[in-house]
């Protein structure tokens, strides 16, 4: 039976209005002291101190340096080099959940000269909280090509990106596991994750059941089915606005995702937080943001 046009319109208008009013799940996170007219990306919060570590580079995403900022009770402090900084490119910081170690990539010197490519390094904490001298992970984790974005899953597999030989495409996701002290096994993450194109950055969720992958076109997600990773699927248009989305970090609960996006002039790279399950008190608030919400550039 056909309905009168007026009746159909009466039914559709409230539905359309509700869709327009649906709250956004992605919001800018641009706190004063951290946000600048340069490119901020790859955030990591120190589980022990709450300090923010992140990468700042030129507007063209060159000259990567890891900086750190502390909440002084009023706002995030002016970012400075990390205590373990060295000459060269440094990026992609990631803390172990207990805060005892930090992984990152660097072209710092292993002898008299800087490395010709990016390698994975780890720094461990002393009992007093200070950082020990960083150590370069051995082969076969590092190779003669570039490695980036090292992230440890709860099961002990260290996921990372690399353009080394033997992959399925130009750049692939790999994973490594330390089978005994100093001895590592490395394997490709497989065709569900990698393609003939580019996959750069892997991020296992805190519970190990999801894997966020930065690849051609932005951010993707895969699920662990108990035996293997499912074929990755691209996240929706609210997250992937222009395909420049990179450097993701999960909240401790796994409910929120902080990432960077190239917004163009004048801001360049900025942080955004995706909260598909609703708001939670993360990223950590500082100063006035504790009462007024995360500060945003106007």
Located regions from the model:
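Positively charged n-region of N-terminal signal peptides that target proteins for export
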Residues: 1-4
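Bacterial N-terminal signal peptides
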Residues: 6-15
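Short, conserved micro-motifs composed of acidic
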Residues: 19-298
């Amino acid at each position: 039976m056909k309905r009168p046009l007026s009746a159909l319109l009466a039914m559709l208008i409230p539905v359309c209005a509700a869709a327009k009013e649906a709250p956004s799940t992605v919001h800018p996170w641009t706190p004063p002291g951290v946000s600048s007219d340069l490119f901020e990306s790859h955030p990591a919060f120190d589980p022990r101190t709450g300090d923010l570590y992140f990468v700042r580079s030129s507007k063209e995403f060159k000259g990567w340096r890891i900086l750190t900022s502390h909440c002084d009770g009023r706002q995030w402090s002016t970012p400075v080099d990390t205590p373990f900084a060295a000459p060269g490119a440094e990026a992609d910081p990631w803390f172990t959940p207990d805060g005892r170690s930090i992984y990152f990539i660097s072209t710092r010197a292993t002898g008299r000269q800087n490395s010709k490519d990016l390698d994975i390094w780890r720094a461990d904490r002393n009992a007093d909280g200070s950082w020990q001298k960083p150590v370069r992970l051995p082969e076969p984790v590092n190779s003669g090509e570039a490695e980036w974005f090292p992230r440890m899953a709860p099961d002990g597999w260290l996921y990372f990106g690399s353009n080394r030989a033997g992959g399925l495409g130009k750049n692939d996701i790999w994973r490594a596991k330390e089978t005994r002290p100093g001895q590592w096994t490395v394997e490709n993450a497989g065709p569900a994750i990698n393609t003939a194109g580019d996959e750069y950055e892997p991020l296992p969720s805190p519970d190990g059941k999801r894997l966020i992958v930065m690849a051609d076109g932005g951010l993707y997600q895969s699920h662990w089915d108990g035996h293997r990773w499912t074929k990755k699927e691209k996240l929706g248009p609210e997250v992937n606005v222009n395909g420049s989305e990179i450097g993701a970090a999960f909240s401790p609960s796994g409910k929120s995702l902080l990432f960077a996006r190239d917004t163009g002039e004048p801001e360049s790279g900025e942080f955004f937080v995706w909260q598909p399950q609703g708001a939670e008190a993360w990223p950590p608030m500082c100063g006035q943001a504790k009462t007024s919400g995360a500060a945003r550039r106007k």
